[in-house]
C-alpha cells in the first residue's frame, strides 16, 4: 500500500497558438500524439496488456464525443481493457490526473497508469442554448464555449482576468512588474528553444498537406516567437480600463496541446527493468474563495511539501508554476518567499501557452526536463484552477 510511484516516461506536443499550427487537430488527436510519444520511450511496456488505467484531463469537452480519455487511449494503441477516466479540474485537470494515477498505484489498484491531458481551445464550439427547445421569437445568441467553460468564473460570471486584477491590487503588483515578468518569460522560452532544452520532451505533430501539398511537422512551441517588447509594454488593459494592469500580452494566450506521463509501481519497475526518471514524493491541493484562485498555489505547495516529508522549502531546487497570468507567477513567488531564479527557468505559460486541460501535466514534464538538464534533484510543480483551487506535486529526479 505504501509502494513508491515512479515516472518512467513523459512527452508532450508542441503548444500551438489559437487558430495556429495545430488547429486542424482535435484535442483527442493531440492527446494520442503525446501518448504515442511517451509509449515509444518505454518499449519494455506492452501496450496490449501492461497498462491498467488512463486518467486524462480535458476541460472543453463539447463535441469531442464520449469519454475523451478513452478515445486517446485507443487511438494511441492501448488495449480495449484499459480503464479510462476524463478529469475536469479546469486548469489543474492534468495535474489532478497525475495525482489520481499516483493514488491508484499507491492503493494497489493499478501498476501502470497513463496520466496527462489534452486541449484544443481552437476547436471548442459555440453553443446555442435556445436551440434545444426552439427559439420562439426575436434574436438568439451563440455562447462561446471557451469563454463560458474555460475563461469565466462560474460564480460571478466575471472573466478570470478580472480576478487577476484583484490579485494585483491586493498584493501591490504593478503593470510594470507584470510586463517585465512576461518579457522575461518570453526571453527564457526563446533561449530554451534555441538551446534545445525542450527537444527531449516534445513529440512532433504531423499536419496533413492540403490539396496535394506535402505533410508538414510542427516541432516547437509556436508562441515564444511572437514577442514584441514595445507592443507588449504598450498593450491596453483588457479587464480594467482605468488603472488596470492585466493585458492580453502579459497573460497566457489561448492554445492547443497535450502532454502525457507514464507512472509505474516499484513492482513493475523491477519486473520490467525500467529506468526511472523520477519518483513522485508527494502532492497537495488547496482551495479558497473563487476570486482568489490566483494565489491558491501558495496554499497547495506547503501541503505537497509536508506530504513529501520536506520541511524546508529552500531545499527545493526548482519550481514550476503555471503562468495563467504574469501576476500568478509573481504573487506565488512573493508569498512563498522564493528565489525567482529557481522559478520557471525555461519560461512559462505566458510565453509557451496554456492549453487548459493539458497544462497541469505540461508543467510536470517541463519541470522534469529542468531537473535533468540543470542539475537539480527536487522539484515542485503547482497550478491554480478556476473556482479558487490549486494542485501541487513534488518530484525527485533519479
Curated annotation (Swiss-Prot):
pH behavior: Optimum pH is 8.8.
One example of a Gene Ontology biological process annotation: ergosterol biosynthetic process
EC number of the protein: 2.3.1.9
Principal localisation: cytoplasm
The protein's enzyme class: transferase
Alphabetized UniProt keyword annotations: Acetylation, Acyltransferase, Cytoplasm, Metal-binding, Potassium, Transferase
Residue numbers annotated as active site: 91, 354, 384
Annotated binding of CoA, by residue: 186, 231, 252
Consequences of knocking out this gene: Leads to cold and freeze sensitivity.
Keyword Glycosyltransferase recorded: no
Induction record: Induced by low intracellular sterol levels. Also highly induced by cold conditions.
A Pfam family of this chain: Thiolase_N
This protein's pathway: Metabolic intermediate biosynthesis; (R)-mevalonate biosynthesis; (R)-mevalonate from acetyl-CoA: step 1/3
Reactions catalysed according to its record: 2 acetyl-CoA = acetoacetyl-CoA + CoA
Coiled coil start-end: none
Positions bound to K(+): 186, 248-249, 251, 350
Localization annotation: Cytoplasm, Cytosol
GO cellular component, one term: vacuole
Similarity comment text for this entry: Belongs to the thiolase-like superfamily. Thiolase family.
NCBIfam families according to UniProt: AcCoA-C-Actrans (TIGR01930)
Oligomer and partners: Homotetramer.
Something else known: Present with 60895 molecules/cell in log phase SD medium.
Name of protein: Acetyl-CoA acetyltransferase
Organism: Saccharomyces cerevisiae (strain ATCC 204508 / S288c) (Baker's yeast)
